Amino acid sequence: MSSTFNPAASSPDEEETGEVKIEDQCVENKQSTPASCSSVSEGSAGSSHKSPTIASPATVSPTHRYLGRTSGPIRRAKGGWTPEEDETLRQAVDTFKGKSWKNIAKSFPDRTEVQCLHRWQKVLNPDLIKGPWTHEEDEKIVELVEKYGPAKWSIIAQSLPGRIGKQCRERWHNHLNPDINKDAWTTEEEVALMNAHRSHGNKWAEIAKVLPGRTDNAIKNHWNSSLKKKSEFYLLTGRLPPPTTTRNGVPDSVTKRSSSAQKRVFGSVAQTSSVTTDVNNLAEDGNGQINSSVPVEEVVAASRMTSLNEYARSPQLPNPEPLPENGGAANNGYHLYYTPQIDYYRASEVDTQRMYGNECGCSPSASPVSFFTPPPCRNVHSNGSTPRSPESYLREAGRTYPNTPSIFRKRRPRVVVQDNNNAKKTDEAKEVDQKVNDGKDSSEIQNNGSNAYNLSPPYRIRSKRTAVFKSRQLEFISREEEKADDETKSSEKDMLIDGDSQLLG
């Protein structure tokens, strides 16, 4: 005995009942393409719109009686379709012109005619369109739903080439239905979804009855993407975790962490400035003693602090002003730019002496650990800050790059310290230099007298340079060697005179 199901002549409730009966006989397809079972009334490949007959236990072929089933589905698929089965199905459809699905199913011992029909309609049919929906297709579905109602999907699919009834039905219920609520989920809806999921599990159609305006597909997506992670917290406390509010696209948690970090940094900068100010006040009093309880190492380390992170980004002076609430963006559109504050920086003597040498008031004979206070400027603004030149900003920025030569650093002048043991030799060298300098011009002597230890002497004639070089060599010649040289020179002169007299005679 067989029964048929005509969707065109049945009511929506009867069609849904028929779909449930047909879907009980379907098998889940494991292919990547959608192959879930739906109503057989969704437009088959043939011209007839009647569903194929459903075999009863009395019409089971003898080859399948070994299953021993007397009720319910007759055959179940043992797995996904193999490439060999797909090729066999194509050949059978070509043989029977896609009309007799009972004869087509005879080619598969473990497949029913419904499974073969769905495999062909949803996967193998070359005329099937699986791509995204176009605007024209959506308008056509809306027009046909107004004409036929949201039930006769097989008739609606006939007006959309390449689409089947199941695709049209899912497109309407998930996207095109004007009753769909597409607003953001409220807390009440999420709590209702939590409670319904505890009762029904993953039965999204049952849960959708509790949430009017939400489709089962939207409910499933929201559960898997958001609420599934909050379910443990809800089961423990009975309420949802507090939502993470955002401020201009930045979560409050990130804003709080950044503000706390800024407070710590600015607090350390303020503490550094206060310690440095105390030390400078002691230096201005003229006392060489430092009676501060702060360790000297900490003060030195704090005085060298010029940026929040010297090695992670470009150098900048610390800014005690808080950042604006819009995530650090200024009113003029620039990001992460702060006006440098001068009052929070004090250079130490070690750094200043390395840059400027001993010309800024730093004495080499001072204590090993001392501090330098820059000389006060006469021009003072109304707010108490002193004007600065661009070179000072460049010098401070250059200090943040260690082991790098700087164009602003000056050479240290060499200081020659005389030793008492070499005083005698130095006096002799001075006497020789005095004899050599007798033939020099007065202007040259005056220039040399102003800078006695200049490493770059003025230009001299070659003969004078040779004389100076010889005079420097005399420092290492003793009196006896000088006498021996004089005797040798006199004997050479006598020999030359005798030789000349013989040639003339």
Swiss-Prot record:
Domain of life assignment: Eukaryota
Compositional bias annotation for Polar residues: 53-62, 380-389, 444-454
Triggers of expression: Slightly induced by ethylene, auxin (IAA), jasmonic acid (JA) and salicylic acid (SA).
PROSITE patterns: HTH_MYB
Phenotype reported upon loss of the gene: In double mutant myb3r3 myb3r5 and triple mutant myb3r1 myb3r3 myb3r5, up-regulation of many G2/M-specific genes leading to larger seeds, organs and embryos due to overproliferation and ectopic cell divisions.
Subcellular location: Nucleus
Gene3D superfamilies, sorted: Homeodomain-like (1.10.10.60)
Residue spans binding DNA: 101-124, 153-176, 204-227
Record keywords, A-Z: DNA-binding, Nucleus, Repeat, Repressor, Transcription, Transcription regulation
Subunit and partners: Component of a DREAM-like complex which modulates a variety of developmentally regulated genes and of the mitotic genes in proliferating and differentiated cells. Associates with RBR1 in both earlier and later stages of leaves development. Interacts with CDKA-1 and E2FC, but not with E2FB, at later stages of leaves development.
Task performed by this protein: Transcription factor that binds 5'-AACGG-3' motifs in gene promoters. Transcription repressor that regulates organ growth. Binds to the promoters of G2/M-specific genes and to E2F target genes to prevent their expression in post-mitotic cells and to restrict the time window of their expression in proliferating cells.
Protein's name in the database: Transcription factor MYB3R-3
